[in-house]
Amino acid sequence: MRWEEKDIITEAKKSGFKAIPIFTKDFYSAIGVGENYSELEADVIIQRNTSHARALTTSLIFEGWNYNVVNDATSLFKCGNKLYTLSLLAKHNIKTPRTIVTFSKDKAVDLAKKIGFPAVIKPIEGSWGRMVAKAVDEDILYSFLEYQEYTTSQFRQIYLVQEFVKKPNRDIRIFVMGDEAPVGIYRVNERNWKTNTALGARALPLKIDDELRDLALKVRDIMGGFFLGIDIFEDPERGYLVNEVNGVPEYKNTVRVNNFNVSSYLLNKLREWIKK
């Protein structure tokens, strides 16, 4: 278990909840066979699987057994697929980085010229900045696309290329819990253009203004889900751009720099939700 899962269990005990960890290696679904996890007594299942595929699958199974799951499988699918995320946000007039998606390497390079270089290539699914690369010209972009083609990803021949947003050396992560956006951080990296904390970015406290809060809650309405981490870029000309949405967000550094108890806040919001 990560720090977050341990903290949820600790805070649950303090709040009077009975927290029961469920490990994927022990989990099973026995359809038409007999005893299974569907007999577990629980008001809510908090989805904290580190694997997107396992998170999506276990949420689907628990929902099939009529459990309340946070987050539900539909919102996890929307968040886990970057193309789906961007398409939904664009449909609802939420500003995002300019993006192209093609099934041809040559077409991807040709369209990338309209976005301009440097350009960013990223996988349709993935986290922690893995397989995300910056191409400074056409030749390098083609090489990255060619490399992707020979990976084992199911989306290896779907090419997603984005503009390189000229943001400060930071991005923003806003946490939404239920109908509130109570806390966020700046993720700052002076040595790498990627601002994932998993890649060395520093977390700094963020004061959420009304514009950011309204934007985060609009994204929540579009994506669904109960507990989201929303990643936002600051563009010098276009303002806030929503880059990605995380359906199983990590928050250890957010707690540390803000002195804000995310686990306790989440559990209290879940208590309110269960009582409705």
Curated annotation (Swiss-Prot):
Mg(2+) 1 binds at residues 231, 244. One of its GO terms (molecular function) is ATP binding. Pfam families: RimK (PF08443). ATP binds at residues 82, 122, 126-132, 162-173, 187, 196. Residues 86-271 form the ATP-grasp domain. It catalyses: [amino-group carrier protein]-C-terminal-L-glutamate + L-2-aminoadipate + ATP = [amino-group carrier protein]-C-terminal-N-(1,4-dicarboxybutan-1-yl)-L-glutamine + ADP + phosphate + H(+). One of its GO terms (cellular component) is cytoplasm. Pathway: Amino-acid biosynthesis; L-lysine biosynthesis via AAA pathway; L-lysine from L-alpha-aminoadipate (Thermus route): step 1/5. Its cofactor is Mg(2+). Its EC number is 6.3.2.43. Binds 2 magnesium ions per subunit. InterPro entries: ATP-grasp, ATP-grasp_RimK-type, ATP_grasp_subdomain_1, LysX_arch, PreATP-grasp_dom_sf, Rp_bS6_RimK/Lys_biosynth_LsyX. A motif (N-[TS] motif that is essential for LysX substrate specificity) lies at residues 253-254. Mg(2+) 2 binds at residues 244, 246. Keywords: Amino-acid biosynthesis, ATP-binding, Ligase, Lysine biosynthesis, Magnesium, Metal-binding, Nucleotide-binding. GO terms for biological process: lysine biosynthetic process via aminoadipic acid; protein modification process. SUPFAM superfamilies: Glutathione synthetase ATP-binding domain-like, PreATP-grasp domain. Homodimer. Catalyzes the ATP-dependent formation of a covalent bond between the amino group of alpha-aminoadipate (AAA) and the gamma-carboxyl group of the C-terminal glutamate residue in LysW. Belongs to the RimK family. LysX subfamily. PANTHER family: COENZYME GAMMA-F420-2:ALPHA-L-GLUTAMATE LIGASE, RIBOSOMAL PROTEIN S6 MODIFICATION PROTEIN. This is Alpha-aminoadipate--LysW ligase LysX. The lineage of its organism: Archaea, Thermoproteota, Thermoprotei, Sulfolobales, Sulfolobaceae. The gene is lysX.
